């Protein structure tokens, strides 16, 4: 018993533990079953949702991803198209502004000369040449050279091309500065003026070159822009020269800077295209073209105005420094004066390009007003007792001229159909001829006027020009008005005649209708009468036929009675 009890006591804990383990295992199995059931329920729910609702949250995410991808693709395509279109746009833009950059840059570099406002000072103070010799014996050769080479370059440009002439002119401009830097001999100074005139005559050929390289409709805009570039070059170089002079730098430095800009202009000219006339050069054709242009009254009118106005302007530009030197006996403000004159003039030079064809209706008024205003300003320059009055007069005068000059040049270019270079050069030659005559008249050969009195003379020339053109434009206006009135009267007469002829025609038509109507009535009456006569005749015939029938009947009765009687 004891052994069995021991065994039982020993077995009890094991059984207890086994029972506990069994209970635990049972609980764990139940938990696992519950978890499995929960998982199955969740899976069933998910499957139900996925089957019945097609997992919309996943579709929304997929749609958003697709939209984002599509947007990214569209953005990438837009960027690619933008960059692909950007390069052609840039190329086309540069092709459009390429002539503007080339021509305006060349004009700017050509005119960029800081030493220009101080040349008289350089001649007198640095080289030691007398002022009277400067403006009576040295400066006139610029005009002579300009005149001769205009004719030569105008003809050569059509043979060898305008580009070659422009390059020759820039080489001559560089040689001009080389002569100024190397010697003070008067003969060499005269040679320097000859090369300077040669370079400016080549610049005139450059203006004709612009006309050849562009459409006629674009020439006025480009001419105004090139003129503005020229003026900006003068303004900026004048300010630079003034600053350098105030820093007590020698004038030789200014000439060296001008030489450098001329070399840059020469390099730029080497890249120009070479335009020339396709037809062979013939002197007879050139002469015939020149005479043909003078058959056009409009061209003659513009030639006369430009000849006188340009000649006076060239003289004023050449001698204004001498005038200020006599007024103030110093040239410390010449840089500011020159820069101000051309700075404000550059804005006025652009105005005609903005107005376009609107300015054609008031051209005559503009030319007349310029003569009056410009002449008064030149007289005021000569009369001015101070540099301020003379400087203000010079600035306003220069603005007026630079405003009118592109208008005249464009009008001349529009009237010309061929040989633009020769005819442009001939226009300047007319101006230079007048300039030589004016300089000879005021010089020591004839009147021997001092510099102040010369400006009175120049102003009087513009006054006469203005009055002459006022009379001419007034005559043309009256002629046009008379012609318009005569045309209107003739139109009224024509209308009256047409009205009378229409009345006559209508009366004749009425008469014809009446005659036709009467004739129809007469014909109708005659037809009625004829019809009546015919009817009467028919009736008579019918009566005769009836009588004959009666007679025949009677005869038949008699014969029949005899038979019966028999």
UniProtKB/Swiss-Prot annotation:
Biased composition (Acidic residues): 27-40
Source species, domain of life: Eukaryota
Ranges in coiled-coil conformation: 24-81, 517-544
GO terms under cellular component: plasma membrane
InterPro entries: Folate_carrier, MFS_trans_sf
Keyword hit for Transport: yes
Membrane topology annotation: Multi-pass membrane protein
Membrane-crossing segments per the record: 148-168, 171-191, 194-214, 226-246, 252-272, 304-324, 332-352, 364-384, 388-408, 420-440, 458-478
Job of this protein: Folate transporter.
Protein name as it appears in the record: Folate-like transporter DDB_G0272544
